[in-house]
From Swiss-Prot:
Anything else known: This protein may be expected to contain an N-terminal transit peptide but none has been predicted.
Organism name: Micromonas pusilla (strain CCMP1545)
Gene coding for it: GATB-2
One Pfam family it belongs to: GatB_Yqey
Name of the molecule in the record: Glutamyl-tRNA(Gln) amidotransferase subunit B-2, chloroplastic/mitochondrial
Function: Allows the formation of correctly charged Gln-tRNA(Gln) through the transamidation of misacylated Glu-tRNA(Gln) in chloroplasts and mitochondria. The reaction takes place in the presence of glutamine and ATP through an activated gamma-phospho-Glu-tRNA(Gln).
Region (Disordered): 20-64
Swiss-Prot/TrEMBL keywords: ATP-binding, Chloroplast, Ligase, Mitochondrion, Nucleotide-binding, Plastid, Protein biosynthesis
Entry superkingdom: Eukaryota
Compartments (UniProt record): Mitochondrion; Plastid, Chloroplast
Cross-referenced NCBIfam families: gatB, PRK05477.1-2
Length: 580
């Protein structure tokens, strides 16, 4: 069959799938033309930058139509590989800091750059967090796990190999329940969880003009960061389930404190393995699966769903033409919703060899038991418990889900509610659990983030004593009791704004200010502002001093207008003078 004939047959099949109707040969030709026009319009939309969001919607709609057409005949089978950075302060095998957004190559130890003579040393915190994840997901914790070298050449991998745990991982087995909609769940089995080191980052820049050359620069800040790779069984059916499963893992990683799992920062990256089979062939154990293809480095839930839908349709079209699906690794372009080949899997030989410089990780039964005692419940368990109508203080499901975003938030809410009930008992008033929850996940969390007084990943973890759940509970009990406050020379009942003002007094107003207003919180906030606005800082130092107003405005926004502008201005001046 000529290439032209094959292309015509493919276009004909796309037209039939899109219109869902039988046709004669003449009508089929017309349908193929319609399909090509629809496809051209969808691709054309993606080339217009001002309508990127509508183009994504068009791509999604196109994929959904094609999926629906073959829904009765074919089944899409998906497995996931998730790579999540763990929340250790330093890297897996070196003492360099793990810090997103740092200056290029600022956090690189000799081992990260593969300098001769440098040796790895395992990060105990990374081992602890990987063990916690395995315990929470019901996996078997290996008492002895081993590292090995996975060899391949890439510019952002200076060693020429990645240290990983393919054959003897720290965790085998486990499961997670995925909400697939309409009140149904699917149990997704986990093959293994392994520790491995991350690669660096390649940044490609193309010069101006039509014939501009592409320059690749390497940032090794990420190289060597500790990753947990979660490999699942092919238990998912379709793109929406794959996206829902990735979201469930993200919530779990955050809730357990294993990592922040921010896809936009690259601290959670997802690969999908996609195959198709005729409906009714094989069972859940993967029998009679078609050949699979892997799509790498998906960084949003929408991209996961779209990539799976496109791959499934591509596989069905190949089979319909009598062609074989080749096992290969592919990339995904979110602009047009299509995948493209990266490499054929048969050509790869990673030459796995034992890692001679890292001894096995040996865990005692006592160590695993201690971690199991400290491991919190999974998010779905916490949500069910908080929303259980049989309890004394059941929350609406949406509010319970917000409270269970982090284990620390759930613990804080329950401690604040308990303190509020104790404080309200002598006053003979009832405390509304939902009101406490709304304050904790709304006002309190927002103010904590603006004031930068806690961690970025878990905002209610490690708060100062003045923000303890006991104090918050007592203040909320006073609100419930209708106690009054005098502001503007007029007494009125206390409200949430008064609670916020009591918890967050004006910054730099006598709290450690000292001479020059050197309040530690203001200083830290101003340094954070300067670090987060490098372009403005460069312009400021080049003579555009009016930008000081922008820095002060950002500080006032973060403190909700309660900071003293003079104190902030002095702190910003010091921070700008320290910035190199």
């Amino acid at each position: 069959m000529s290439r032209l004939a094959r292309d015509a047959a493919a276009a004909l099949r796309r037209g039939l799938l899109a219109t869902r109707r039988d046709a004669t040969a003449a009508a089929s030709t017309s349908a193929a033309t319609v399909s090509r026009g629809r496809r051209a319009r969808a691709v054309s939309t993606t080339t217009t930058t001002s309508s990127s969001s509508s183009s994504s919607a068009a791509v999604d709609a196109r994929d959904a139509d094609a999926d629906a057409a073959d829904e009765d005949a074919w089944e899409t089978v998906v497995g996931l590989e998730l790579h999540a950075q763990v929340a250790a302060d330093t890297k897996l095998f070196s003492g360099a800091a793990r810090q997103y957004g740092a200056r290029v190559n600022a956090n690189v130890a000799p081992f990260d750059a593969a300098l001769p003579g440098s040796l790895p040393s395992v990060n105990a915190r990374a081992v602890e967090l990987a063990t916690r994840l395995g315990v929470a997901l019901g996996g078997e914790i290996h008492r002895a796990s081993r590292f090995e070298r996975k060899h391949y050449a890439y510019p952002d991998l200076p060693h020429g190999y990645q240290i990983t745990q393919r054959r003897d991982p720290i965790v085998r087995g486990g499961r997670i329940d995925v909400d697939v909609g309409a009140g149904a769940t699917r149990r997704l089995r986990i093959e293994q969880i392994q520790l491995e080191m991350d690669t660096g980052k390649s940044v490609n820049k193309t010069g101006g003009g039509g014939g501009g050359t592409t320059t690749t620069t390497i940032d090794l800040n990420r190289a060597g960061c500790a990753l947990v790779e979660i490999v699942t069984r092919p238990d998912l059916r379709g793109g929406e389930e794959a996206a829902a499963a990735a979201e469930a893992f993200q919530k779990t990683l955050r809730f357990l404190g294993v990592g922040d799992a921010n896809m936009e920062e690259g601290s959670l990256r997802v690969d999908v393995n996609v195959s198709v089979r005729r409906r009714g062939d094989g069972g859940d154990d993967g029998a009679a699966l078609g050949e699979r293809c892997e799509v790498k480095n998906l960084n949003s839930f929408r991209s996961i769903a779209s990539a799976v839908r496109f791959e499934a349709r591509r596989h069905r079209e190949l089979i319909a033409r009598g062609e074989n699906v080749e096992r290969e690794t592919r990339s995904f372009d979110p602009a047009n919703g299509e995948t493209a080949p990266l490499r054929r899997e048969q050509t790869l030989d990673y030459r796995f060899t034992p890692e001679p410089d890292v001894p096995p990780i040996v865990l005692s039964d006592e160590y695993v038991a201690a971690i199991a005692r400290d491991t919190p419940e999974l998010p779905d368990v916490a949500i069910r418990r908080l929303a259980d109508v049989r309890g004394d203080h059941a929350l609406p499901l949406k509010l319970a889900t917000a409270v269970a975003t982090h284990a620390s938030t759930a613990r804080y809410y329950e401690a604040a509610l308990s303190a509020a009930k104790r404080s309200a008992a002598p006053r003979d008033v009832d405390v509304d659990a939902a009101a406490v929850a709304r304050f904790v996940v709304g006002e309190l969390t927002g103010e904590v983030k603006r004031a930068s007084v806690a961690g970025r990943v878990e905002p209610l973890l490690g708060l100062p004593a003045r923000l303890s759940p006991e104090r918050v509970g007592e203040l909320l009990a006073a609100v419930a009791a209708g106690e009054t406050t005098a502001r503007m020379a007029k007494a009125r009942p206390m409200g949430w704004r008064d609670v916020v003002d009591a918890l967050f007094p004006p910054v730099g107003d006598g709290e450690g200010g000292g001479e020059g207003g050197g309040d530690a919180a203001v200083e830290a906030m101003c340094r954070d502002i300067v670090c987060g606005m490098p372009e403005e800082v460069a312009l400021f130092k080049a003579g555009k001093t009016r930008l000081m107003g922008k820095f002060v405005g950002e500080a006032m926004r973060r403190t909700n207008g309660r900071a003293d502008p003079k104190v902030v201005s002095r702190a910003l001046t010091r921070a700008l003078s320290e910035e190199v």
